[in-house]
Regions:
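A short, Lys/Arg-rich alpha-helix, primarily the initiator
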Residues: 1-19
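Residues within the helices of the helix-turn-helix
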Residues: 14, 25, 54
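Alpha-helical residues within the helix-turn-helix
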Residues: 18, 29, 58
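Short alpha-helical DNA-recognition segment
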Residues: 21-40
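DNA major-groove recognition helix of helix-turn-helix/homeodomain DNA-binding modules
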Residues: 51-66
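Short amphipathic recognition helices of helix-turn-helix/homeodomain-type DNA-binding modules
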Residues: 66-83
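Nucleic-acid endonuclease domains
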Residues: 82-179, 195-299
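Conserved catalytic cores of phosphodiester-cleaving nucleases, focusing on short active-site segments
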Residues: 181, 187-195
Length: 299
């Protein structure tokens, strides 16, 4: 690495380390290097080789290519190490947001780490797209497409993430086929995925019985700040709720207005509220929070 880029890389690694609460010694142990190495780097007394850079990226569970791109943005003055470290921290779904893990496992065969991995995979894809758009002077994806199309795209990314992170339990079905995720081995099941914005109810074109996993998201800023209301929507997708449940055809409310090409089957409110809440980020709650019991779908 050239010197300016190397120094930016070191500063970024340091900021991420501090944001995660890691000591120099702990990071060194995770990277498999001598305990004095991190101190020498941060003091500017040593610059990282390609091998060492790769070890540090691996220790932080981040792609080296991504860290190098971010170091380049620091050199250009586009952002700071502290901002990037905060984004990395907030874009990593937290285990404390998992609820009813036993129901997630019993209904879908998925473990919490698989769900968290799928969400993080989606975030990484979205952020990569936004970085490329920004590099060409464009606007973020959330401002480039209609919200209905954004929901569809995010749903596809989440579906791909589940398949990727499921340790072989699931593969994606072909486009526009039911169910979205096909089981490959026990305890996986036919799994339909639905996506909705904010407080909207997940819906499809036809009522279909089966096992459902639903995701709802909000639009905040890149640091995770979120304010309720359409006028306050940001440009960064944040998953705030995931639910799972067994749904029958009678659990849908259907609309079929003559001449209306947009036939819809929406999961009934009481049924949806009773579905097991398996991921919940209160910081991004689009409802008015109750004094007791979170929100109407909390369980």
């Amino acid at each position: 690495m050239e010197r300016d880029l190397a120094q930016a890389f070191i500063n970024l690694i340091k900021s991420i380390r501090e944001t995660r609460g890691l000591t120099k010694e702990h990071l060194a142990d995770l990277a498999g290097v001598h305990r004095t190495t991190i101190g020498l780097l941060e003091k500017g007394e040593r610059y990282p080789t390609l091998q060492l850079s790769n070890q540090l990226a691996g220790a932080l569970q981040l792609p080296l290519s991504e860290l190098v791109k971010e170091a380049e943005s620091i050199v250009k003055g586009i952002t700071t190490p502290e901002e990037l470290a905060l984004i990395h921290n907030n874009r990593t779904p937290k285990i404390e947001h998992i609820r009813n893990a036993n129901k997630l496992l019993n209904l879908t065969g998925l473990e919490p780490k698989m769900l968290l991995g799928a969400i993080e995979s989606c975030y990484n894809t979205l952020d990569s797209i936004d970085e490329q758009l920004a590099g060409k002077g464009g606007v973020p994806l959330a401002h480039l497409v209609e919200l209905a199309n954004l929901s569809s795209m995010v749903g596809n990314m989440i579906g791909g993430g589940i398949a990727e992170c499921s340790d072989g339990l699931y593969i994606r079905n072909r486009p526009h086929a039911y169910p979205d995720l096909l089981p490959q081995k026990a305890p996986a099941v036919d799994l339909e995925l639905k996506m909705a914005l904010e407080t909207n109810k997940p819906k499809g074109h036809l009522p279909k019985a089966g096992t459902y996993i639903t995701f709802r998201y909000v639009l905040g800023d890149k640091f995770g700040n979120f304010n309720r209301g359409k006028d306050n929507r940001g440009d960064t997708v944040w998953i705030w709720e995931v639910k799972v449940g067994q749904i029958t055809e009678d659990d849908f409310s259907c609309s079929n207005t003559e001449g209306d090409s947009g036939k819809t089957a929406v999961i009934k409110t009481d049924i949806f509220n009773e579905m097991a809440l398996v991921y919940y980020n209160e910081d991004h709650l689009p409802y008015t929070k109750r004094k007791v019991g979170g929100y109407v779908g909390y369980n």
